């Protein structure tokens, strides 16, 4: 049975808006992060999300950072280094949780690091954030 164009367009619109698409468009950010990793790029503002695969001890040298590893849908891993001197810690973080992020990507051989996931008190750097269980940490 062939659908007329008058049925196809409303059906397409209905289907397009009934799908639960994450706000970060994970596929797009995953491909941006994969390209940044492959090209060894740094200093990129990026938004995305991933699943916590490992929780690491805090880095307490200099500014304190909460650290954990996210696995993206494309398999790439990212170290999240979240400055807990400037932003609240995610206290209820567990392996398997989803975390959305917006921050600065820095290349390394293990997949990269995202930092600047907080506000900048001096206002010179774009503010970043983490989102976990509906709460934003900035």
Residue ranges and their predicted role:
Residues 2-10:
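Bacterial N-terminal signal peptides that target proteins for export
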Residues 5, 19-21, 25:
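Compositionally biased regions
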Residues 10-20:
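Bacterial N-terminal signal peptides
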Residues 23-138:
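OB-fold and OB-like single-stranded nucleic-acid-recognition modules
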């Amino acid at each position: 049975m062939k659908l007329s164009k008058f049925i196809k367009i409303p059906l397409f619109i209905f289907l397009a808006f009934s799908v639960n698409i994450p706000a970060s468009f994970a596929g797009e950010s995953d491909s941006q992060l994969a390209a940044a990793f492959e090209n060894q790029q740094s200093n990129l503002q990026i938004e995305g999300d991933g699943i916590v695969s490992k929780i690491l001890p805090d880095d307490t040298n200099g500014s304190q950072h909460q650290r954990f590893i996210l696995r993206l849908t494309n398999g790439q891993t990212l170290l999240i280094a979240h400055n807990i001197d400037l932003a609240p810690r995610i206290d209820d973080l567990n392996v398997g949780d989803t975390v959305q992020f917006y921050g600065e990507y820095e290349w390394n051989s293990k997949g990269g690091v995202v930092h600047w996931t907080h506000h900048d008190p001096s206002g010179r750097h774009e503010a970043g954030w983490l989102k976990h269980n509906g709460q934003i940490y900035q």
